From Swiss-Prot:
Pfam family, one: OPT
Biophysicochemical property: pH dependence: Optimum pH is 5.5.
Gene it is expressed from: OPT1
Descriptive protein name: Oligopeptide transporter 1
Family: Belongs to the oligopeptide OPT transporter family.
Membrane topology label: Multi-pass membrane protein
N-terminal signal peptide: none
Listed Low complexity bias regions: 13-26
A GO cellular component annotation in the UniProt record: plasma membrane
Function of the molecule: High affinity transporter for glutathione. Also transports tetra- and pentapeptides like the opioids leucine enkephalin (Tyr-Gly-Gly-Phe-Leu) and methionine enkephalin (Tyr-Gly-Gly_Phe-Met) across the cell membrane.
Other known facts: Present with 2870 molecules/cell in log phase SD medium.
Predominant localisation class: membrane
UniProt-annotated stretches for the region Disordered: 1-26, 43-64
Length: 799
């Protein structure tokens, strides 16, 4: 029998003089333990990754060679008997200490949750209707909440005799309480996607929106997925391999802010405490962003080769070196936001093999294939920009969807025949094609690599063992029964039926069922993918395509099908991520369940309330010439997409112009099988084992609006971080996630201050450094061919 002791979290700025120790008893037969440790050693010795032994304790040296972060490898043993996580990135960020006696369910937790959810949801909703828009990142809430919580912890310790459970000062502001507030804000502060649907319906389809309908649409589209998140915990949240890398940045930030322990660890010669390191990075990042973000924006879009008089209007030069509509062949920037635009998830938390797979895909499809097809004028590509997120008509203007609508906003085929076919830039088409492949590849990959584990965990949720964090969590806290999540899901699906059937949505109930099934069927494969790689496959395109064939010429139905077919899964996976964060922070799962539902209800009410107020109090809202920029660009994009994707029959069916893209569904099936066969047949072929087909297909999914320029920057930074990891592993383990938290929080706070205090009131700084990068073909999204007035391009018949 072995015993692991964990000291309590420090509740104050100074270490507690009498830390609580909570023993965990782990029973195991000595023979099994010896055999297990022997298997661990054999597994580690068989791995080929090199490590830096300097400044690392012997226990961590045993497991550092096996890392999802470095090689995408999954621990094959049983982590039940390990004293810490088998993954070094988790060990370096997440503490195994816990004090379950810390009280969290008190007025201050709920007060801070309410205030931050209301403020962040309201501000983000307000600016979501403006272009350029502003979204305040939850990292800002995580940083700002800390001093406010510490101030509230200074209140006198008054109690009320009539309310015995009330205490004005429930104790020190702990990192657990901080985590509860942050988790609530992270899930609900961003504008609910349903609000873009409501904006499109109300402002562009002129639909009279009942307030009850708006609440139901927002709540159901978010909380149906919560049920799926809870019911799939055994596959998506609980396993040790479900790292959810993005959460490690938040964990490191909590630890940096709250821990005042004397750090004796020497990391490659560095002794600086992580808290001080975080503050230095945070302040430096905040101050520096003012330079590329406002004072000298040319340092952000650093296409310096195009600043000369001979290159700025040279189409070939702009195609090669352009940062906005070109290939970005000179990937240099002084602005971190250009890096973060590339992939979902922080570069500090994204495994290097994910960055490598993604960049390989970008090089093949967008640096090699795209220029070849563009300059051969395939599918009339030269009449459109090289990279663009817009669609065009046959006069090179952006496609005006209102020209093909009836008064009831259904599509009029006669008007479509009279107007123009839809032309899509090749960058957008490649993004569609890769998404088609990714949707299939994620299923094939999941079956091949995780199928047995999925079946085994279905039969026994503890199959494969539990790591130290899950053991602590399950011993110290009561879990939420599955029936809680099942009941939540049933209730929300029922309310979803009310929303789509009792109001004039033009969305049949059977289509609602199919949309929900798409989200639920994709949940486990997508959850496993995101938990390990920090990436996910967007279902927006495939749901629009499916609905376009099921319910052709019905754009209103297309809106709601995408909402329930994609956002239900997306929001559910966001909760899965936060459930993992709650496990890392050792916060009661029952409290998290209650807080998340409460925060979602409150944020939905705030979203709807703010948008309704704006509709009635801002003149010219959602018009293109609104003087303050409240043009509803997001709602307009959703509106346009719903109409265009109601016409897939005329774009992707047999004999139509873009039909060859449908072959990528087959590629998505065959490519993972081929890679798996090579890995199985040639196990010593190191290159093959690093190929991850879902990531390869879905990684470049942000192009457009991102460009290869952004992806080159992301890969370069990821490469440097991985080099540091290999050369100075101790330093990387101690400071990497803290550095990521400091950089991203500093930039996020700086963006908010610049926008609210300078740009929104009308402040401008017009000089050469802020204008030179705009005087290029790259910024103008120049086309290779320019038609004269009255000319058209394309084919004669498109129906």
């Amino acid at each position: 029998m072995s015993t692991i002791y964990r000291e309590s979290d420090s509740l104050e700025s100074e270490p507690s003089p009498t830390p609580t120790t909570i023993p965990i008893q782990i029973n195991m037969e000595e023979e099994k333990k010896d055999a297990f440790v022997k298997n661990i050693d054999e597994d580690v010795n068989n791995l080929t990754a090199t490590t830096d032994e300097e400044d690392r304790d012997p226990e961590s040296q045993k497991f550092d060679r096996h890392s999802i972060q470095e090689e995408g490898l999954v621990w094959k043993g049983d982590p039940t008997y390990l004293p810490n996580s088998p993954y070094p990135e988790v060990r370096s960020a997440v503490s195994i200490e816990d004090d379950p006696t810390i009280r969290l369910n008190h007025w201050r937790t709920w007060f801070l949750t309410t205030v931050f959810v209301v403020v962040f949801a309201g501000v983000n909703q307000f600016f979501s209707l403006r272009y350029p828009s502003l979204e305040i990142n939850f990292l800002v809430a995580q940083v700002v909440c800390y001093p406010i919580g510490r101030i509230l912890a200074l209140l006198p310790d008054w109690k009320c005799s009539k309310v015995p459970f009330f205490d004005l000062n429930p104790g020190p502001f702990t990192k657990k309480e901080h985590a509860v507030v942050t988790i609530a804000v992270a899930l609900t502060s961003s504008t609910a996607y349903a609000m873009y649907i409501l904006n499109a319906q109300g402002s562009f389809y002129n639909m009279k929106l009942n307030v009850g309908y708006q609440f139901l649409l927002v709540w159901t589209s978010q909380m149906i997925g919560y049920g799926a998140a809870g019911l799939t915990r055994r596959w998506v949240v609980n396993p040790a391999s479900s790292i959810w890398p993005q959460t490690l940045i938040s964990v490191s930030l909590f630890d940096s802010l709250h821990s005042r322990k004397v750090e004796k660890t020497v990391a490659n010669g560095w002794t600086m405490p992580r808290y001080r390191f975080f503050l230095i990075v945070l302040i430096g990042s905040f101050i520096w962003y003012w330079v590329p973000g406002f004072l000298f924006t040319g340092l952000s879009y650093f296409n310096v080769i195009l600043w000369g008089s001979k290159t700025r209007h040279n189409f070939i030069a702009n195609t090669i070196f352009g940062t906005q509509s070109g290939l970005g062949a000179l990937p240099i920037t002084f602005d971190y936001t250009q890096v973060s635009q590339a992939m979902s998830g922080s570069v500090f938390a994204t495994p290097f093999y994910v960055s490598a797979n993604t960049y390989a895909s970008v090089l093949i499809f967008f640096v090699i294939v795209l220029p070849c097809l563009y300059f051969t004028n395939t599918w009339y590509a030269k009449y459109m920009p090289v990279i663009s997120g817009s669609t065009y008509d046959n006069t090179q203007n952006k496609y005006n969807v209102t020209k093909i609508l009836n008064e009831d906003y259904s599509i009029n085929l006669e008007k479509y025949k009279e107007y123009s076919p839809v032309f899509v830039p090749f960058s957008y088409l490649l993004s569609y094609a890769l998404n088609f492949a990714a949707v299939i590849a994620v299923f094939v990959h999941c079956i091949l690599y995780h199928g047995k584990d999925i079946v085994a965990k279905f039969k026994d949720r503890k199959n494969g063992g539990t790591d130290i964090h899950m053991r602590i969590y399950s011993k110290n806290y009561k879990d939420c029964p599955d029936w809680w999540y099942l009941l939540l899901q049933i209730v929300m699906i029922g309310l979803g039926f009310v929303a789509v059937c009792c109001f004039d949505t033009k969305f049949p109930a059977w289509a609602f069922v199919i949309a929900i099934l798409i989200s639920l069927v994709n949940f486990i494969p997508q959850g496993i993918l995101e938990a390990m790689t920090n990436q996910h496959v967007g279902l927006n395109i495939i749901t629009e395509l499916i609905c376009g064939y099921m319910l052709p010429l019905r754009p209103m139905a297309n809106l709601l099908f995408k909402l329930y077919g994609f956002i239900v899964m997306r929001q559910g996976l966001n909760l899965s991520r936060d459930l993992k964060l709650a496990m890392y922070m050792k916060v009661s799962p029952r409290l998290i369940f209650a807080v998340q539902i409460y925060a979602t209800i409150i944020s939905g009410m705030v979203n709807v309330g703010v948008q309704e107020w704006m509709m009635h109090n801002i003149d010219g809202l959602c018009t293109t010439d609104q003087p303050n920029g409240f043009t509803c660009a997001n709602g307009r994009t959703v509106f346009n997409a719903s109409i265009i994707w109601s016409l897939p029959k005329y774009l992707f069916s047999s004999g139509r112009i873009y039909n060859p893209l449908m072959w990528f569904f087959l590629i998505g099936l065959l490519f993972p099988l081929a890679v798996y066969a090579v890995q199985w047949k040639f196990p010593k072929f190191k290159f093959a084992k690093h190929i991850h087909t879902p990531v390869f297909f879905t990684g470049p999914g942000n192009i457009p609006p991102s460009t290869p320029y952004n992806y080159s920057l992301f890969f370069a930074m990821s490469f440097c971080l991985n080099l540091i990891r290999k050369r100075w592993r101790a330093w990387f383990n101690k400071y990497n996630f803290v550095m990521g938290a400091g950089v991203e929080a500093g930039v996020a706070i700086s963006v908010v201050i610049i926008f609210l205090c300078v740009q929104y009131p009308g402040g401008k700084l017009s000089w050469w450094g802020n204008n030179v990068w705009k005087r290029t073909y790259d910024n103008d999204y120049k086309k290779f061919y320019t038609l004269k007035k009255g000319e058209t391009f394309g084919y004669d018949k498109w129906w």
